[in-house]
Structure formats: structure tokens, C-alpha cells
Design a protein with these regions (language model features):
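Catalytic cores of carbohydrate-active enzymes across secretory and cytosolic contexts
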Residues: 1-549
Length: 549
């Protein structure tokens, strides 16, 4: 298309969305200027820009700051989205320096919570069960009509329990098969291998808690091992035993993640935990599906607020497996009482070690006081009625909100349609609107620092208080230089103050353009005072254009 760089950049930006998937630093690569020169020294010349202009695409300020790939993505995308509501707040805080002059709540960093594809992740037995009571149209309509999920109520509790028990037996059969090969390969002692396999063969019906995912340190796989004595009493309860099954992989360069796996295997070899703490190697999609449908509880213990979304718990819900997780990521939106268990959203301690100890204590107590009784309390048919009700609640109230069709529609309605309109507008008529828009932006840059406040008239609260019901007013006279009144928007902003600083906008009102005084532009803003108190306010001037975003 042979567009100049700034024009091409604008066209790319107006047709791009950047989805950020993690707040963890490892997910946001940064490179030194020397390293960038080694690989990209030829790029600026090809783009007809300077080296500093190229580097500025990945920096907040022109300093010795490293080149951030994430900053590059944000600067070259008109929309940015996180993958859960909490992740949106975290992302806004992370990248606020890229949006000078705006509060976090104003930043156009939106969110679309992740979701999963039910037909891919719901096991065949559950699919058949739903189709048997909801009809063949279940998968077609379960997104827009959540009542389809309530058809599970037509399944008898005994049928649900038999289905779930069958899935667990299938999991245990596969585990025995895999561990019989894996344990000798990792040089486990013969008596430990025999004891572990015997335990799995004879006790597949015990409460089974699964933890399987990437072993990053923020996932806190170590949490339940903080108090081994307490853990031993839980897993070895003579009447109500519990088994934990772990699986996952660490990144080859993540030494801390590898150490977590080593610790789990180390604990699993202790006499009191043989057969009760299991680590399964070679985690893959096949094993993930077995665990998701076969365990009773899906455990997730991330460090707050580093769980951008998480999807394994959604997949667990699709298979009648109950979640026990920190209220972070998707679970902060999905959790309903009676549909799983939760650790509170906020940290209690600034010290991560103390927070880990508290969370571990809460996990132990929740397992002992809530999860174990709900699982082991049975009726005359041997069915845990309370547990079955929780499975139903999870299907009723959680599963319908985390389906890929919902996610795709949100992306389409929030972003894709507007991106199409932007691109069409800018590219029509051989890019005429694009060239006009770039010319307008250059005019803004050329004149912005020259705008002059000629006069300001406003109510003087230092002389007298403004009675309730009266109007607070501000009148401005501006010299906009080459700019027109339509090129700018002026706002009267009232700030929310916490601990001596303005942290957010309480409310804002746009000034009205009321005419010209010679070559100067006149603006007015009036606001009725409906509440008493001390107000912190400011005036903000910013560019405006239909294509500015």
C-alpha cells in the first residue's frame, strides 16, 4: 500500500486489539537497547523513522528504559483487554503511565472473561446425560437460554453419583497404569511403588482433590504442605480419608517451579503420605481431561491478584467437579455459595509468608469442616445428597457464564465490529480519511503547547460558602491558535480524595462552547451543588475527534 509510516501505524492501530493474558513479569518481555540494536538496527531505516522513534514504540519515556513488547502492543492497538474483571483493574494499574492525565477508571482497558468450549471439555458421559434430559438442542441453545442447564434437575441424584463414581474409577484405573510405568522410571523404592498402587486400587472411592496446571511459583502448589502434621491428619483420617493428586510441568528455565514439583514428590515419599499424595508426570491434554472429570474437587491457590483468569476450573465445572479456589481471576466472578468453596479475595497480610500460612490454615479448615462432611454424608442409597446439590448449583449458576460463545459475542460486540468500522472509514476512497486524520493529529501536536488561557472566572469559595441548591460555575476564555472549538473538549472534574491524594473521578461535566470573543473561544460550565462538603476539582483539556480513540 506504500503508506508513510505514521499513516500505516494509525491504520494498524485502528484495526488491532491487544489481549493481555497475565500480570506476571515473565509474560511481559523487556529488552535492553543494545540487544534491540543487535537484531533490529536495520528496521528504522526501512520504516523511514529514527532509531529513537522506533525505540519509543516500546517505552514510556525516552530514557535508558528497556524496550517493552507489551508497551509496543498497547501503542499499536486501539483496544486493550484483560481476561477477567480483576485482571482489568490490575492491568490498568500496571500500564497507567502510558495514559498520562487520566485516572485508572477512565482507561480504555476493557475485559472479556475467558471461557471454555463445552463440547471439547465436557466428557462424553456428561454430554449424554444432558442430551438425555434436555434434548439434542442442548448444545445449540445453552448459551442464550440458561434454563437448559437446569435440565440436570431431571437426573436422579443416584444417576449423577453413579456417573461421577464411574469417572473416578476410570481416572484411578489410568493412574495405576501410568504410575506403574512412571514410578520405576524415577527410581522410586519398590515398597513405595507397591504401597501406592495398592492404595489406589483399593480406595478409589475416597475424597479426591486435584491440582494440575503449569507449575509457576505464583500458583502456590506448596501451600498445603506448610503444616505437614495437619495435612497428615487430613489425608489419614480413618473414617474420612482424603487424597491429593498433582500433575503439571514447569518451564525449563523456571528453577523455582521445578523445585515445587520436587517438593511434592519428596512429600509423597514420606511414610504418612504414601498413596495419599500423588504426583503424575507427563501432564498433557489427555491426563488433564481424566483429572478434570475424575477428581471430586479442583484446587487452585494463586497469589492474589496474579491469576488473570484461569480456565481449568471452568473445565472442572463442565464435568461435575467442584472448585475450591482463591477469589481471583474467573472464580471471583463465577463463585456462588453452595456451588464450590472460596478463599477471600483480599490479602490480609503484606508479608507473603504470613499470607501463605493464613491461606493454608483456611484450606485445612475448609476441607475438614465443609468439604469432608459434604462428601461423606450419605443417604440410605449411599448418595451424598448435599454434594449432588452443589454439583447442580455449579451447573445452574456457574457453567452458563463461561462458555466460548458468550466470550466470542463479547469480543465481537465490544471490539471487532468497531475495528471493522474504523478500518473501513480510514481505508475508503484510497485512504482519504486516514490522510485527513493524520493531518489533524499533526495540527494538534503543532498547536497544543501554544494554547493559552486568557481568562478564568469562577465562584470563589474562599470568600463565602456556596449554599446547597446554588450553582457552581466556571467561565473560560481560551486562545486555541489554529485549532477550532470542535477540536477540543474541556471537562470540569471533581476528584475522589483518599489519604491526601486524588485517586479517582467522582464526577465530571463537559464545558459548553458559548461563542467567540474576537479570535478567542468562550466556554462555560455550571453544576448545581446538591451535597455539602469539600470538593476537589480541576479542569482538563483534551483533543477530540470522531476517529480519536
Amino acid at each position: 500500500q506504500h503508506l508513510p509510516f505514521q499513516h500505516a501505524l494509525e491504520l494498524v492501530r485502528k484495526s488491532s486489539i491487544f489481549t493481555t493474558h497475565t500480570p506476571v513479569p515473565a509474560g511481559h518481555d523487556k529488552f535492553s537497547e543494545n540487544l534491540m540494536r543487535a537484531y533490529f538496527a536495520h528496521i528504522p531505516e526501512a520504516l523511514d523513522i529514527s532509531w529513537d522513534e522506533f525505540m519509543d514504540l516500546g517505552r514510556v519515556k525516552r530514557t535508558d528504559e528497556k524496550f517493552s513488547v507489551t508497551h509496543l502492543a498497547i501503542k499499536t492497538s486501539v483496544y486493550v483487554n484483560a481476561v477477567s474483571k480483576i485482571h482489568q483493574d490490575v492491568t490498568r494499574e500496571m500500564f497507567k503511565d502510558l495514559y498520562r492525565g487520566f485516572f485508572n477508571s477512565e482507561l480504555f482497558i476493557d475485559y472479556v472473561t475467558n471461557a471454555v468450549h463445552p463440547k471439547t471439555w465436557m466428557c462424553g458421559d456428561w454430554q449424554k446425560a444432558f442430551l438425555s434430559v434436555a434434548g439434542n438442542e442442548f448444545f445449540e441453545h445453552m448459551h442464550e437460554n440458561h434454563d437448559y442447564w437446569k435440565f440436570i434437575d431431571k437426573l436422579k441424584p443416584l444417576s449423577i453419583w453413579k456417573l461421577k463414581t464411574y469417572q473416578k474409577h476410570e481416572l484411578y484405573d489410568k493412574l495405576v497404569e501410568r504410575l506403574a510405568k512412571e514410578m520405576p522410571q524415577r527410581q522410586e523404592l519398590p515398597n513405595q511403588i507397591i504401597h501406592t498402587l495398592e492404595e489406589l486400587n483399593k480406595t478409589p472411592e475416597i475424597l479426591t482433590i486435584g491440582f494440575a496446571r503449569r507449575f509457576a511459583t505464583y500458583k502456590r502448589a506448596h501451600l498445603i504442605f506448610i503444616d505437614l502434621k495437619r495435612l497428615a491428619s487430613i489425608v489419614n483420617n480413618p473414617q474420612y480419608p482424603v487424597r491429593f493428586i498433582f500433575s503439571g510441568k514447569a518451564h525449563p528455565s523456571d528453577k523455582a517451579g521445578e523445585d515445587l514439583i520436587k517438593r511434592i514428590i519428596e512429600v509423597s515419599r514420606m511414610p504418612e503420605f504414601i498413596g495419599k499424595i500423588i504426583f503424575v508426570e507427563n501432564y498433557d491434554t489427555e491426563l488433564a481431561k481424566l483429572l478434570l472429570k475424575g477428581v471430586d474437587v479442583w484446587l487452585n491457590t494463586p497469589t492474589r491478584p496474579l491469576e488473570a483468569s484461569g480456565t481449568s476450573g471452568m473445565k472442572a465445572v463442565m464435568n461435575g467437579t467442584l472448585n475450591f479456589s482463591v477469589l481471583d481471576g474467573w472464580w471471583a466472578e463465577g463463585y456462588v455459595p453452595g456451588g464450590g468453596w472460596a478463599l477471600r479475595q483480599e490479602n490480609t497480610y503484606d508479608d507473603p509468608n504470613l499470607q501463605d500460612q493464613l491461606d493454608a490454615e483456611m484450606i485445612y479448615s475448609t476441607i475438614e469442616d465443609e468439604i469432608v462432611p459434604s462428601f461423606y454424608e450419605r443417604d440410605i442409597e449411599g448418595v451424598p445428597q448435599k454434594w449432588i446439590e452443589m454439583i447442580k448449583n455449579a451447573y445452574f449458576h456457574i457453567a452458563p457464564h463461561f462458555i466460548t460463545k458468550r466470550m466470542l459475542l463479547e469480543y465481537d460486540n465490544k471490539f471487532y465490529k468497531q475495528l471493522f468500522e474504523y478500518y473501513k472509514t480510514l481505508s475508503d476512497n484510497d485512504y482519504q480519511n486516514l490522510f485527513k486524520f493524520i493531518s489533524w493529529k499533526r495540527k494538534i501536536y503543532r498547536n497544543w503547547d501554544e494554547i493559552k488561557l486568557e481568562n478564568i472566572e469562577m465562584f470563589d469559595s474562599s470568600k463565602r460558602h456556596l449554599p446547597l441548591g446554588d450553582k457552581f460555575y466556571v467561565k473560560l476564555l481560551l486562545d486555541l491558535k489554529e485549532l477550532k472549538p470542535d477540536d477540543v473538549i474541556i471537562e470540569l472534574i471533581f476528584g475522589k480524595k483518599e489519604e491526601g491524594r486524588i485517586v479517582d473521578i467522582e464526577f465530571a461535566k463537559t464545558f459548553d462552547f458559548v461563542g467567540c470573543e474576537g479570535s478567542k473561544s468562550k466556554y462555560e460550565c455550571t453544576i448545581p451543588m446538591e451535597q455539602s462538603g469539600v470538593y476537589n476539582f480541576s479542569i482538563r483539556l483534551r483533543p477530540q475527534h470522531p476517529l480519536l480513540a
